[in-house]
A protein has these predicted regions:
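C-terminal functional module detector
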Residues: 5-11, 17-424
């Protein structure tokens, strides 16, 4: 790509499916086990300014093993290495940890190779996106076009018991380190196993571009003013700056004010960032504006969150802070969590109560733990009310109970690209 760029051909690459990389995607050593050097780090971020955070083969934001205090960390986890039945190592495979590790490298005066933005993708091989739970036919029509093939309902006939016994015999005769789990028995029923049941109906890439042209869209990707959703077409804005006030959330020109006085998703700022009215004191905490609108064909929003990561002398740290709650509820300042809003799903027909959420949420949040000398990143996460997962829709249409080891419901979401704070 660098050679092409010298010839006037501009391009970028978007790494994907890091969750299934077994720690290879964001490792801190090269192929020979040597520590990353600055030349490699610069090449990496120059050519890979954005990464895929969600797609059909699972979501790569974070993992419960890596983010044990994040109640939403287990969203659509595909635990396997890509195209195998072997488990993928979480460390080095998820983007939030990579953001943290990149800051730690930067703390040592090295270029941060992982200061990237986020997009979502589909990665289906069926000539169609698969980002709607109620109309999901999975990745490969020939291999996962039916509910039984997808593993959401039991296999019957020869494909069931006979397929299970055949798999057991094959695994005994020819054991593989990559695993053999094409069938699984649960409560007496035989289901398709492996990674397919863990696939998600995801995702979408969104860009804030000045116009719908190749040049403008590419520029948005290059400056990382992009975000991802797990499928619904939510609209998300995220800004950081100094001197923001709450009137900007409702002002007709609030977005223009935010651009003028700060940086948008994907950007960087520092303690001497100008607001247009001069420099700001190092002790001033920045403000963060989050605005989100729900997809009217999906579910209402439940909460807005800001995910913060930072590095200090003790290492890297992360936190998840609710900043806006549905229905005008207030965040509990002791827990940084919204109260439960009563959203529920009727598993018998997947109906929801749309009155329990909000179709639009916005907030201005000031970081009470901000330290001017401390590197940090911030990104917005938008959480919908619960809705049925695709596997539950399959079970309803087939007339069987939902598969017990799969989540019956999910909370669709969106992620902004991170904004990085860099000390002077």
């Amino acid at each position: 790509m660098d050679e092409l760029r010298l010839k006037g051909v501009e391009s970028l690459a978007i790494p994907h499916n890091s969750n299934g990389s077994n720690g290879q995607m964001f490792k801190l050593v090269d192929w020979a086990g040597n520590q990353l050097d600055d030349d490699y780090a610069k090449k990496r971020i120059r050519n890979e300014p954005i990464v895929e955070i969600t797609q059909i083969k699972g979501t790569s934001e974070t993992h419960p093993v890596l983010s044990s205090r994040d109640e939403w960390a287990g969203f659509e986890i595909m635990p396997y290495r890509v195209a195998t039945g072997a488990l993928s190592k979480p460390e080095g495979s998820y983007v939030r940890e990579a953001l943290l590790n990149g800051m730690a490298l930067e703390q040592k005066s090295m270029t941060n190779p992982y200061q990237f933005g986020f997009v979502g993708s589909s990665d289906t091989h069926s000539a169609a996106s698969q980002n709607i739970e109620s109309n999901f036919t999975s990745k490969l029509g020939l291999l996962s076009g039916t509910a039984a093939q997808r593993g959401s309902v039991p296999q019957t006939g020869l494909a069931g018991e006979f397929g299970y016994l055949t798999m057991k015999v094959a695994a005994k005769l020819r054991p593989s380190p990559l695993g053999n789990s094409s069938r699984i028995r649960i409560n007496g029923d035989i289901y398709s196993g492996g990674s397919t049941p863990t696939f998600g109906a995801s995702g979408l890439a969104a860009a804030w571009a000045e116009e719908n042209t190749r040049e403008s869209l590419y520029s948005a990707f290059r400056r990382k003013e992009v975000y991802a959703t797990s499928g619904p077409r939510m609209q998300v804005r995220f800004f950081a700056g100094y001197g923001f006030d709450e009137s900007m959330l409702t002002a007709a020109d609030g977005v223009e004010q935010a651009y003028a006085g700060g940086v948008s998703m994907g950007g960087t700022f520092s303690s001497n960032h100008s607001t247009g009215n001069g420099l700001v004191s190092e002790r001033s905490a920045p403000g963060f504006i989050v605005m989100a609108s729900a997809d009217l064909e999906s579910a209402p929003l439940q909460r807005l969150q800001i995910v913060k990561g930072w590095v200090d002398k003790d290492g890297t740290h992360e936190d998840v802070i609710d900043v806006a709650c549905a229905g005008g509820a207030k965040v509990n300042l002791a827990t940084n969590r919204c109260p439960y809003n009563g959203a529920a799903v009727d598993i018998s027909d997947c109906s929801i109560n749309a009155e329990t959420g909000s179709w639009h949420l916005s907030a201005l949040w000031n970081d009470p733990e901000f330290k001017a000398e401390q590197r940090a990143f911030y990104y917005a996460r938008v959480i919908e009310n619960p809705t049925c997962r695709w596997s539950t829709w399959d079970s309803i249409r087939t007339g069987v109970a939902p598969r017990p080891d799969l989540p019956a419901t999910i909370q669709e979401r969106a992620w902004s690209s991170p904004i990085h704070y860099l000390p002077k």
